[in-house]
Amino acid sequence: MTVSTTSLCTPIVKICGLTVEAAHCAISSGADLIGMILVPDLKRTVQQTKLKAISRAVTRIPGVPTSPSRGIDRPSHGLVRGTFSADYTSWPLVVGVFRNQSLDEVLRMLRNYDLDIVQLHGSEPLHQWTREIPVPVIKKFGLGEDDLMAPGLHAVTLLDGGAGGEGQKISWEGLPGSGAFMLAGGLTVDNVAVAVKIPNVAGVDVSSGVATDGMQDLEKNCRCLFRNAKGW
């Protein structure tokens, strides 16, 4: 694996939050995508009572610019310019994370919680679903899976270890040599600065890597993660 010494563009940074407070911290720190895990019965699944509040918090934090015209540092990677920027004029965006749920459930939650992006972590039939889901789709893959970089099936490829969201690190040595993608799996405050310099990594997706005993450490890990990922 070759790691460049400088970053040519601002990477996308996505973080999953459990609470409104976590979303506030992530946004003020520079998050581009705020994820809500909507898979039932996982440790990091967002409680139903908090979903709407987190979604609303993304665009209603006083003093935090949500429009590029008001100075927010939008991610500059070409993957974002070609995928998200034409559709959205404000940042950050809300991402709903699903795994092997029905299409009806995905569409219902998309409408109910004003999701900007759908992220699929299971064995969903992309050929059918991407025609039905009216927002960009981030699709999780493991290394070597079929359709990993197939054009037209999904907006963004996410490479992750295991089922995803479990902190299982993916082998960086086997990452694709072409085509932009987002990287997840075992990313932490300590290694994210290296991860964003790997060729073709357009962004990072972090969840358990900013947790302390299962709870997000808002003042330390979260803010430090964004400083390291963005190079601020």
UniProtKB/Swiss-Prot annotation:
Q: In which pathway does it act?
A: Amino-acid biosynthesis; L-tryptophan biosynthesis; L-tryptophan from chorismate: step 3/5
The catalytic activity of this protein is classed by the Enzyme Commission as: 5.3.1.24
Q: Is Isomerase found in the keyword set?
A: yes
Reaction equations catalysed? N-(5-phospho-beta-D-ribosyl)anthranilate = 1-(2-carboxyphenylamino)-1-deoxy-D-ribulose 5-phosphate
**Which Pfam families does this one have?**
PRAI
Keyword field: Amino-acid biosynthesis, Aromatic amino acid biosynthesis, Isomerase, Tryptophan biosynthesis
Give any GO molecular function from the UniProt entry. phosphoribosylanthranilate isomerase activity
Q: What are the GO BP annotations of this UniProt entry? A: L-tryptophan biosynthetic process
The top EC class is isomerase
**SUPFAM superfamilies xref list:** Ribulose-phoshate binding barrel (SSF51366)
Output the Gene3D superfamilies linked to this UniProt entry: Aldolase class I
Keyword Magnesium present in the record's keywords: the answer is no
Q: Which family does it belong to?
A: Belongs to the TrpF family.
- HAMAP family attached to this UniProt entry: PRAI
Name of protein: N-(5'-phosphoribosyl)anthranilate isomerase
List the source organism: Lipomyces starkeyi
